[in-house]
Amino acid sequence: GRFYPIVNYFEPTGSDLAKGLLMFNHGVPWSEQVERSLAIHTANCAGEDKISMDDRVLWTYVWMDEILEASKDPHNSEWLNKYSTDKKTKFQLISAILEWKKLEELGREDYLCHLPIGLDATNSGLQILSALTRDRTGAEETNVINHPKKEIGDAYMVIAKSVLDNGFTYK
């Protein structure tokens, strides 16, 4: 099933602005997994969501100096404008870079992460079906297991390619 909050606006399934403003009351202490999740979330919000999870972490650390610089003045940051222009996740990206600033300022010992980090299923229905039927190809294309080419699986593109390769057309 699905969970839908009663409120109309300020909720985790709301707009980018609503998601960017949300913070948990109780934070989670720093750990390698928390930092990795924050790095993946940052890359996702910057539009780098089609590369592997490891590459998203690497992408974030490659841009860390710019991320920390952008956190000083997000409104006037050229880097932030480059990675958030016309993005659906601009405010979430701002929240993520401010979280990196907090980690930098407090240090790992005193840091608590209050930022909700969304984890999106690739295609949850196909993921469940692939797992239950032990369909290796389906599991690879829905990212239940690692793809052999170390790519992010994309079941929708595989289906679309199959349809087009078999001569189906849309009229």
Model-derived features: positions:
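Non-catalytic nucleic-acid-binding interfaces of large nucleic-acid enzymes and RNP effectors
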Residues: R2-K171
